[in-house]
Amino acid sequence: MTTITITRPDDWHIHLRDGAQLKDTVRDISRYMGRAIVMPNLVPPAIDTETALTYYDRIKAQVPAGSQFEPLMVLYLTDKTSPDEIRRAKASGKIVAAKLYPAGATTNSDSGVTDLKNIYPALEAMQEVGMLFLVHGEVTDSSIDIFDRERVFIENILSKIVADFPELKIVLEHITTKDAVDFVTQASDNVAATITAHHLLYNRNHMLAGGIRPHFYCLPILKRNTHQQALLAAAASGSKKFFLGTDSAPHAKDKKEAACGCAGSYTAHAAIELYAEAFESVNALDKLEAFASFNGPDFYNLPRNADTITLVKKPWNVPATYPLGDTNVVPIRAGEAIDWQVE
């Protein structure tokens, strides 16, 4: 039986939601992740230090006994985020980054940034105090094809931010294109990217060919196979610039299986197992530990986790649904087998 032991991984991009759903999302992600960067796009969003810290307390209250799971908090940038707010957030010791959501780009992004120039004072403060800048890299112009929005964002917006703030550490989150891989690879050491398990395992054919499969619908949207292969190559390359970020984003079953379904795929139930499948598919299991457990903390200047987990190649069947507060979520690979499990 094949087994691999790796340093305990972290998730550098997750949506835990709030309220009644929190106990279920925290239960799933805390099983073997040491830490997670928690997205701030709540309703209302975590736009200030106080809101982010009270959210931290709600998450910690749901961490199961015996788990050392630690949430790492993020400030939601708006047109009005002040340099003083950035300094307050950094001083808290619990808020490690601030997030750019272009207004309207994704779930609960309506409070996001309408013009990049509006956050330049905040970015200057972040560069000064060493707070990371997390980016949802898509333009929101309705005239731009949804499959091109990441590429256009990189060309028109991100390249300028990188040039204007050379000392700012930037994470281009949940990259989905060869364009993003190439940009991050060629950029300075201050630019990195997270990659999801579902973008490594699937492409738009899985979502659209032979019937619409709404549980694969996420933002940024799944791209063509050539982009998927570029992501796999980047993740398995050994480059320190790429690391694990699930972007696990639960929605109730009826919100996904609808005439206008929500964007987001749920993978927290089996995150590292799905990544193991992806790395095995390109004969790169030896590169999984660095991607999952080393590159993220190194980029964030945080210590690596001290303990380990063991994965065993032993197929198991994923339930059709998992509880999500007072409703249910359909996970990726629902009703099907996953090849790996945590021992």
UniProtKB/Swiss-Prot annotation:
The active site is at 247. It comes from the Bacteria. Substrate binds at residues 15-17, 41, 136, 219, 251, 263. Its EC number is 3.5.2.3. GO terms for molecular function: dihydroorotase activity; zinc ion binding. The modification N6-carboxylysine is found at residue 99. It catalyses: (S)-dihydroorotate + H2O = N-carbamoyl-L-aspartate + H(+). Zn(2+) 1 binds at residues 13, 15, 99, 247. Keywords: Hydrolase, Metal-binding, Pyrimidine biosynthesis, Zinc. GO terms for cellular component: cytosol. It is an enzyme of class 3 (hydrolase). Binds 2 Zn(2+) ions per subunit. Its cofactor is Zn(2+). Pathway: Pyrimidine metabolism; UMP biosynthesis via de novo pathway; (S)-dihydroorotate from bicarbonate: step 3/3. GO terms for biological process: 'de novo' pyrimidine nucleobase biosynthetic process; 'de novo' UMP biosynthetic process. Zn(2+) 2 binds at residues 99, 136, 174. Disulfide bonds: none annotated. Homodimer. Belongs to the metallo-dependent hydrolases superfamily. DHOase family. Class II DHOase subfamily. NCBIfam families: pyrC_dimer. Catalyzes the reversible cyclization of carbamoyl aspartate to dihydroorotate. HAMAP family: PyrC_classII (MF_00219). This is Dihydroorotase. It comes from Shewanella baltica (strain OS195).
